[in-house]
Amino acid sequence: MSEVTRVTVWNEFRHEKTDGEEPQKVYPKGMHNAIADYLKKQPGFEVRTATLDEPEHGLTQEVLDNTDVLTWWGHAAHQEVKDEIVERIYKRVLDGMGLIVMHSAHFSKIFKKLMGTSCNLKWREVGEKERLWVIDPSHPIAAGLPEYFEIPHTEMYGERFDIPAPDELVFVSWFEGGEVFRSGCCWHRGAGKVFYFRPGHETFPIYYQKEVLKVIENGVRWAKPSGGPAHYYGHVPEPLEKITSSK
């Protein structure tokens, strides 16, 4: 495990190029660069970006082998992500790479594969207020945050969110229209850690908000490989101790 946490910020990067003025105005360099620019300023991070339209979606085996934590944003082109790249990411997560899944990436191939469920939910896009409550203040992802924070205008996601029960639940969101949502969920998969974080939308400046960026930073620090012992599976012909009772 590297002393520096190597982060790859992945973005579909379609809305900012093709969806008219609003996404381009809000994120002229793409959402991935809004996130990466912040992470590059934080201590202990080495940051690169990758996007869908790059060869191999920017996620060659070499890139993934040199990634401690991968962040993922996608929405309109989930089906364009090649299955072999998804399998490549999946194996790296099981081997210990952290994965941060954001907003509409709940429908991404990699998240659905890791969850084993539909990952479906309710939604509404009218620009309403979201209030995120920290419900586990002892969790590392909540470090440095207030008891709650608000996003002035966002897309609503509502329960039921069809996911396995999280190993750890850090945030719950309330929306101005009345819905609630499990908006900060953690799982362990193999040797890797997965964090789903709800906020983030292509037409709202959410990835410039300090609390949101702090959560992403904390999520990366939590999800990075821990440096624990490697585990081995399969037949073990040589016992650790002498066996005297075998036939």
Where are these regions (language model features)?
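Short, solvent-exposed loop/turn segments at secondary-structure boundaries
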Residues: 20-26, 207-210
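Catalytic beta-strand/loop cores that center a nucleophilic Ser/Cys/Thr
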Residues: 46-48, 65, 121-198, 233-235, ...
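Cell-envelope and extracellular/periplasmic
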Residues: 12, 73-75, 200, 224
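A glycine-rich, often tryptophan-bearing local segment used as a flexible ligand/cofactor-contacting loop or short
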Residues: 77-145
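Extracellular ligand-binding/catalytic regions of CAZymes and related secreted enzymes
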Residues: 2-4, 125, 189-247
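Helical hinge/lid and interdomain linker segments adjacent to catalytic or ligand-binding clefts
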Residues: 24-108
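Short beta-strand segments enriched in small/hydrophobic residues
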Residues: 2-21
